[in-house]
């Protein structure tokens, strides 16, 4: 019985795909509504709904389409984190023996887009509005593998520190809550029976840059006192002051970057 049902369903699908021109004339709005699903490293899983009909009688509307979409990394979190972990394998050196490791990405965004097909083909230009957030958590660490008995020295905001041991660990977090206009381009490649493959690539001109927060544990941490030319346990106030200075310097550099990139690949179906 199941084989018969699947066989009849396949026949119905084939007939609906390859029916000849004797079918009744469809209303003007048919064959334009579409929905799709895609993936992106900076957005995760994306779903959208929209409309584009290049056969409209209007000499202007036939060149345009519209889409609204939502995206989140939650369904693909393990895959994205594994990709980041492979990229940061053994850590990424940022100087003074300090490395970044174990990145964890959380992101989401919504968008309202207008597509322009200048040649009524597969290529389109896209503009619109995007809002969302991105959070990247990472571990920072340092060690001296060749000399396990030595102290680990490093500089922070101009002050000289060391941990009472040959390693240290901390964390860095980047938060980016944004909104702004989107500009990009893309392609829609028809496959068969209303199915298509799409590519989107563009940037969001964000209203604000990302912000970094740095956390360094103070236990077993010593600072060099320039006035007495001696080492001593760091006070929480002194460490917080240097951490704030380091964050300010990092955020000043981040303020020069306000473009949030987006590249998406996926499939769509036009009704």
Predicted ranges, named:
Residues 108, 115-120, 126-133, 139:
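Secretome/extracellular-domain signature
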């Amino acid at each position: 019985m199941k084989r018969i049902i699947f066989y009849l369903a396949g026949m119905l699908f084939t007939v609906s795909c390859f029916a000849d021109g004797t079918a009744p004339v469809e209303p003007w709005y048919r064959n334009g509504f579409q929905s799709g699903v895609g993936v992106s490293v900076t957005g995760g899983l994306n779903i959208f709904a929209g409309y584009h009909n290049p056969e409209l009688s209007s000499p202007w509307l036939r060149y345009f389409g519209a889409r609204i979409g939502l995206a989140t990394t939650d369904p693909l979190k393990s895959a994205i984190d594994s990709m980041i972990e492979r990229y940061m394998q053994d850590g990424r050196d940022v100087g003074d023996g300090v490395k970044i490791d174990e990145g964890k990405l959380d992101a989401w965004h919504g968008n309202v887009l207008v597509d322009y097909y200048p040649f009524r083909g597969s290529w389109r230009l896209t503009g619109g509005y995007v809002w969302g957030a991105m959070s990247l958590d990472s571990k920072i660490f340092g060690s001296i593998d060749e000399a396990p008995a030595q102290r680990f020295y490093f500089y922070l905001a101009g002050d000289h520190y060391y941990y009472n041991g040959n390693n240290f660990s901390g964390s860095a977090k980047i938060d980016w809550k944004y909104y702004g206009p989107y500009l990009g381009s893309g392609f829609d490649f028809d496959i068969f029976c209303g199915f298509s493959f799409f590519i989107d690539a563009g940037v969001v001109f964000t209203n604000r840059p990302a912000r970094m927060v740095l956390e360094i544990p103070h236990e077993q941490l010593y600072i060099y006192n320039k006035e007495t030319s001696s080492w001593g346990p760091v006070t929480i106030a002194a460490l917080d002051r240097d951490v704030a200075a380091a964050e300010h310097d990092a955020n000043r550099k981040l303020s020069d970057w306000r473009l949030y990139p987006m590249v998406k690949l996926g499939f769509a179906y036009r009704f």
